[in-house]
């Protein structure tokens, strides 16, 4: 029995117990800088206190004691102390060269204690999970507000670092690979890719656990994915379990856990924080209180593995033994949802193709071979305009977007990476799955490594033989993508019904039997070819495709059928109505035989029912090849309609704009600006700002009025979980565009004496010493920059003296400090009142999220609002300090009614 089989066997019998927080336990030992360094790391530069992973070498007695305490508390699985032991995170400490040694040592240390406890009680075997953290960088978000296409880490760089870590953990003897605290699915996919490569190279097979952290009340990751989209994105990897950790306490985590357990075909884990931090930043929830909440998960059959994250200790874990049993018998663990055979794709949101689903439209216009406009925009580097084509397709109903840059005058790989990085930064577009379309394999792989969702690849074929076909399929299996399979082999392209089904059947068997490719991820394209070309041998092409579609759906279980629909009518290019009508008739018949997706123009307005009955018969006859004369009749009809169209009396296709979508343009200028900011639309920002300048005497009033009002609304929506992070960043970019237009006017008015206000001043920002995570800081810096603040970024792990020196040198108006990776909590305002504001003479403000940062900063430095806002803050902090003192003297609860009266209203 393999390790995975043993663990699964146990999970079917009972809920397993994972250990608790490592960092919280380490803090209780009050270690010094010298403890962290020891003899081994005495020459490392910079501060090392807080680099917990070093302790497996410098203080193995401490880490070993923590392992022992968790095992004595009843943990079935203990984690290695290796959360940050890859070179990306260790770079901030100057400790990259020690990564291999740290991981091997961490694994061996945990292995020793686990084996000792297993030997004492073989009936309760203990397992070691290699802890693999998310790193302090993200593949899916740009670190530069002015360049949304920029990334400070690539998939390949992440995968390489992860592979080195994973191989060292395996060498050290771990039983499980635990990829945890996932905030960016693309990072997780790189870790899974690395795990697969490491295990293949070392000829081992270990179970993999995944644990994701949600970043907002809507239950999305920091990079914007829903939980269902996240699971779709990693579904290829064959992991043992999927779960949640960090983020919230058990109570707030429950709705997300219920959702995950309802659809994920995996065993489920959960290890929440010990409630929410109090006003002093401490976790006050007791072990028994948390156990009561976690017991609900167990009693309701939601989980298979329970543990603890931030704030938990061995005392918390010790409570779990009592909640997984009832009258001495183990409670029934979660039973994973039965896996189906439906195609499951994802962008920021999930897309399933279920039996009976409507036809899946794949937008065709972001293809340089199919859209001359798109090609021109790409050649001219007008990427924002090119993105509007993608956005328009999504608005018009495209459920997947085809992306193709195969053109002799383009660097297809470079363009694919650049455009996808831009596209995935736009949540209105990135919510749908993508089809990575190229005849060049390096371009396909480069595209897949830019996207956190599960894509479709267009395409693979047997054209270069079985070996290359299977090699490509294995790569797709490893990275996680569905694929289009063209009806093309070593002989050539299939044109007849017989050749189409011959090639498709052969490809299906190779994929399912030799690669174990999921049949639901196979999408056959039996070649949509042009009809009515004037060549008789082409006249059956549509009918052969339709008949092949029916055969595939009946004989190749769970496989799908797609095609490039516009190819059918290519001989009528220039005659838009005929092309649209012919395509509509073709789709009507092909869908009836089982074609369930296709590359189409989603803006096309002609449907089967729109076509004149007499014309419809001609189109039908040509598609279904009812007679040898059918194609000629279609050609004659096309000529007639084109003549009428040219004379102005015929039907023609025009841009089918969604009138409702543009209704906001009729609103007042204030409402238009607010709408544009909420939606991140820059198309009309210049004309709206010019109109606003006619209404507002001072340009700065537009910033302080409608623009800041809109940003405030965005903050409210974000706080309520009705907007998510990528949308906020997009909003901030629109704000920046608006301010950029206003800035010259502000300067001119200043010189003319109309306004004494200068442009908004500098803000110094840093992540505090002991925290290597710069993602939250970068998001705040992005929003501040977009609101016309000049941001000076000191980076991560910033010592106090460096911050003070920089503040003296730069003389910024505001110093902004970041020190939390988990979502900000309202309790932190009490921390500000009690521990920070009381020791500073200047004003100190707390903001609950990035979207509020610019609003608070502007209030602080604006002479019109500063005094009142600072007074408001001081009154608030004084009240909070008084309440805290009273609570300490007399710790009694207040009524719900009184609590509601005292609710915080900072903004």
Enumerate the language-model features and the residues they cover.
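Domain-level signal for soluble alpha/beta catalytic cores
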Residues: 1-885, 907
